[in-house]
């Protein structure tokens, strides 16, 4: 059984949202249960990542966070990290501004250059 742990202001714990489902269809009920339970247990944040070139298909991170924003009310929502060279800066800014509005200011944006250099030539 999982129990909530209070660590005060010393440590803030976050967890990853399920984004990949090996050899099975995407199960949004799993995403729902994990997200809501993490909030109930007092986790500070939920995280997605962008794995555009991964072997397994995964859910688009900002769209997934918008879904989770509608299921939760206090937990922060972040991407660790978006592969910046693959995005239009204006569209990315708008997507995150929309997520931040939809979540009442809970969005956390992480950007980086990406995973490995091979996909970029």
Question: Where do the PLM segments sit?
Answer:
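Catalytic metal-binding/acid-base residues of hydrolase active sites
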Residues: 52, 82, 114-116
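N-terminal beta1-alpha1-beta2 module of alpha/beta enzyme domains
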Residues: 1-71, 76
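Structural motif
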Residues: 49, 80, 110-112
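Flexible, glycine-rich active-site loops centered on histidine and acidic residues
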Residues: 7-26, 86-121
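Structural motif corresponding to the early beta-alpha repeats
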Residues: 76-88
């Amino acid at each position: 059984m999982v129990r909530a742990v209070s660590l005060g202001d010393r440590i803030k714990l976050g967890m990853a949202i399920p984004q990949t489902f090996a050899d099975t269809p995407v199960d949004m009920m799993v995403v729902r249960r994990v997200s809501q339970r993490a909030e109930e247990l007092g986790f500070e944040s939920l995280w997605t990542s962008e794995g555009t070139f991964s072997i397994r298909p995964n859910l688009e991170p900002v769209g997934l966070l918008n879904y989770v924003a509608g299921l939760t009310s206090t937990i922060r929502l972040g991407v660790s990290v978006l592969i910046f060279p693959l995005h239009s800066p204006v569209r990315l800014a708008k997507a995150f501004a929309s997520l931040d509005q939809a979540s009442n200011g809970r969005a956390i944006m992480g950007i980086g250059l990406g995973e490995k250099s091979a996909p970029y030539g």
